[in-house]
Amino acid sequence: MSERQKALDTVIKNMEKSFGKGAVMKLGDRTDRNVSTVSSGSITLDSALGVGGYPKGRIIEIYGPESSGKTTVALHAIAEVQRQGGVAAFIDAEHALDPVYAKNLGVDIENLYLSQPDHGEQGLEIAEAFVRSGAVDIIVVDSVAALTPKAEIEGEMGDSHMGLQARLMSQALRKLSGSVSKSNTIAIFINQVREKIGVMFGNPETTPGGRALKFYSSVRLEVRRAEQLKQGQEIVGNRTKIKVVKNKVAPPFKVAEVDIMYGKGISREGEIVDLGAEYEVLQKSGAWYSYDGERIGQGRENIKTYLKENPEVRDEIDQKIRKAMGVGASLEEASAQKEEVPVEDKLFDDELE
């Protein structure tokens, strides 16, 4: 062994004594090089994300205009984590979470940890405490724009508080980023959009809370309504576009189109109809759809109703589509094979706190 290697080994041993085992290692020695994920609750979005779902131990931003479906997308992620036996927390800074709607989306509201903070500092401190515990699998903050700094709440209505929220988010994310990675928690921040004044060229839209969240996010999703869905004259939902505008774990800029039905969330049946026809699992002739050589209905909405009434056929088609797309296990398979993380790996060493 050369003198250089001996010197390096000595330095590494000293660092491990000071900061704990694993403080420095070769990248090739890591056992978690493959990105571990949780399904988003949508086959199309799982495919657009490139790795089969939301990456664990990463920060994710979901932003878009009002009533575009941002909270719905986040609640579906919570439902998937809970279905696999995970623990979820929701920081409701907007004080607007509808428990009945969350339940309709599949969220176990009896076991969802909820906080409605009085100000931004309190909300982010609670989020950090949840993450540092190592016992929470997913945490959602709704929304960044509603994380009002304490000084602004206690001040007068017309007072100027330039850059306070951006400073708050920057400080919080510096503390959160390492904890999120070590605890393998998925941290989802929902954000609104604002318009910059005086922009003549390019997109005038921006997100509140400064630039820090843009930098620290591994995945950024832009959610926008595309068109209304009707049954006769009644509007029953929206066709929604979800664009992956930033992705550190797969190629970005892919777009997922989903049906978000009022009171029910993302329509799994709608995705199965569209993707089934695209990947030729379902055969389409004019307005008629066939499966395994047998006609099952005419028109997209009628096929969605048929699949709702025949869950065995729906699940069978779902699995064939996932196999054709190369996207992870189906929802039922995922529930049966929850990956257990040893407690000693999840909890932080007291010496590091």
Swiss-Prot record:
Key words, A-Z: ATP-binding, Cytoplasm, DNA damage, DNA recombination, DNA repair, DNA-binding, Nucleotide-binding, SOS response
Asked if Ribonucleoprotein is a keyword of the record, the answer is no
Which domain of life, per UniProt?
Answer: Bacteria
- State the InterPro entries in the record: AAA+_ATPase, DNA_recomb/repair_RecA, DNA_recomb/repair_RecA_CS, P-loop_NTPase, RecA-like_C, RecA-like_N, RecA_ATP-bd, RecA_C_sf
The entry's localization annotation reads: Cytoplasm
Composition bias of kind Basic and acidic residues appears in 335-346
Describe its function.
Can catalyze the hydrolysis of ATP in the presence of single-stranded DNA, the ATP-dependent uptake of single-stranded DNA by duplex DNA, and the ATP-dependent hybridization of homologous single-stranded DNAs. It interacts with LexA causing its activation and leading to its autocatalytic cleavage.
Q: What is the name of this protein?
A: Protein RecA
Source organism per entry reads Macrococcus caseolyticus (strain JCSC5402) (Macrococcoides caseolyticum)
Q: Which gene encodes it?
A: recA
